[in-house]
Amino acid sequence: AVASAFIDKKIITNDIMYSNYICHVAWFSSEHYSEEKVIKIITQYNNLKITEDNYMSDNFSNTYFSLDDCRKIGFIRQDIEDKFNLGYINARERALLITSLLYAMDKIANTCGHYDAYRQGVEFEKHLELYVPQPEPDVNENNVCYNMDTNELAPEIEADLIYIDPPYNSRQYCDAYHLLENVARWEKPEVFGVARKMDRTALKSDYCTQKATVAFENLIDSIHAKYILLSYNNMANKGNDRSNAKILSKKGKVKVFSEDYKAFSTGKSDIQANQERLFLCICNNERKEVIPSALNYTGGKYKLLSQILPLFPKDADQVV
C-alpha cells in the first residue's frame, strides 16, 4: 500500500470496500494487540479439520475452493466473530485475523485473477494456510481508517498529501472481488448466479459509470490539501475521458509522470501502449468559497466559474 511509505506520519485511509478497510485497520491502526495471541490462534486454525457444513460450504464448495477448504474458511470466519463478540480479541486482533484469512483465500482461489468466474473441472491442489501478518510496530497513534464513500469523506478532512486511486474503467471492484467482500463482512447474504455473487448495489461506484467525470470534479473541488497525487491507468485509449489534468488544474499546478504498465487481461482484449500515470497537483493555498445560487435556471454560469474567476478583481472579498 502507498500508505506504507509514510508509516511514521499520521495516515488517514479510506475505502468503500470493507475487505480493504479491514486490511487497513490491520496494517495501520495504532490499537495495541497481542502478537502471541494472534500467532496462537492462527496456529490453531491451520491445524483444523472441519467436517460440518456452514455458510461457505453450502454456497461455494467446489467453485473457488474445495469443499474442505470452504468448510474451514466458514468455520474460521465465524470463530473470529465469536471471539470478538465474547471480548477474547480486540478490534485490531480481529482485523489481523480476517486479513490473514482473506490473504490465504486469495492465494489459493481457483480464479483467473478475480472472482467473476472460476475454472471448472480442475483439481484443487492448493489448500488454505494462514500466515501471521507483520504490521510495522511503531505506527502513528493518530492514524484513522474509514470505510466510506470518498466523495462524502473528502470535505471532512485536511491533509498535507492526499493520494487518490479511483477505478479507471467500467469494471466495478465489488464485482471482481465480491467473495472476499462477502467473507470480510460476514453478513451471510443470499448469493446467486454461476459466480455466486451477493447483492452489491450499495457498493457500486460512480467512477465506473458515465457519472465518473462529475464525481471526480466534485471530489477534487472538495479536497483540502497541499498536494493531490492521483494514480490513473490510461488503458491505452479506453476509458480515459475524465480530463484528469484539466480538472486538477482548477486546484493548482499539475505535473504528470508516466510509466509503461502491463494490464491484467482475461484474454478477451489486447490492450497496447498501456501506462500508469501519476498526476501531482500542487494546490493553491488560497481557498475560494463559491456558493451556487439557489435559483437553478437554464442560463446559470456556475460551471463556468473556473474560467471566469481569474478575471475578477483581485481585491474583491465578496462578489454577489
Show where each model-derived region lies.
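Residues at the starts of beta-strands that form the adenosine-phosphate
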Residues: 10, 227, 318
